[in-house]
Amino acid sequence: MNTNQVSTRQNSLWLIAAMAAPLAKGASGCSWPAVLAMGGFTLLVGWWLGRYRMAQKPWLDILQGLWTSVIISEMLYWCGDCWPSHGNGKAAALILLALSTWSACRERQQAARVGCMLIWPVGLLLGLILLSAAPEVKLQYLYPTWQMPDAALVTVLLLTTLYTGKGKGESAGVCVGFLCFAMITAVVAAGTLSPYVSSTSKAGLYELSRSISFFGVSQRLESVAAAGMTIGYFGGISYLLSIPEEAANRGRMVLAYGALAGLLFAMNIRLDSRIIAVGSILLWIIFPAVCSLKNLFQKPPKTA
């Protein structure tokens, strides 16, 4: 969670570009009450992390890095789901991983500049899909119902909270923005596809792009959705791989974590998304809290 080598604003822009596609994937499979509940939980976690000190042990850094590889391998599956009609989703995902690893191997400031540039294509392409589908929303599909939230959404929301500067004022606004984006995506996906279809689809935004019509004429925007999501996953994977910035062997760590993610994906070793979510909560919230019981309720010193 070290972000001191890039400015807070730069980190926020990079994080927006990196997490927009994973967040859209998770939110498109959830009902809006579930998104609201999970968003409120992660905002509370962000406030807590910003208010109280959390210890970080070397062994915990290693476990978090290994678990990050598991999350990245899951993102590769999400990327492959964006290209179901082409039959080469696995190859596209592996190429994406190679490019993301190459980007992350450079200095973090350079990777951040590249990541910030992604906010424009990701925002425009995903925004086009959501705006085009909004007129197709049926109000009867938006009746409040509770569905167990997609565990992928839990993991992504947790990541957005962890890497936004630990509760600083400008970062709190980014977290609220992520929650609003997730709510809009959930409402548009469920209102257009129906709650059942959106919750059972592997790639809700891709399915959403097939249900758009202009003036009664059906439009096929699958390529637009797939391109926007793929660019977003590139940003997300490169961001996660770029997190270890202060280690002397940073380049080798990035290559090792990227290789582990690729190996898990190539060998079809995939954990259930609920296990990934529980593991993320344990490694980034529970274990650090247990390791820092002495200063858990000690407020951090004020900075000038």
Segments (PLM) and residue ranges:
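Helix-loop-helix connectors at the membrane interface of multi-pass transporters/channels
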Residues: 75-88, 166-183, 237-261
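Hydrophobic alpha-helical segments and their helix-loop junctions in multi-pass secondary transporters
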Residues: 72-81, 120-144, 189-190, 290-302
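Hydrophobic, membrane-embedded alpha-helices of multi-pass small-molecule transporters
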Residues: 5-25, 34-42, 64-72, 105-106, ...
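Extracellular/periplasmic helix-loop-helix junctions in multi-pass membrane proteins
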Residues: 251-254, 262-282
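Membrane-interface loop-to-helix entry segments
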Residues: 90-94, 100-133, 277-288
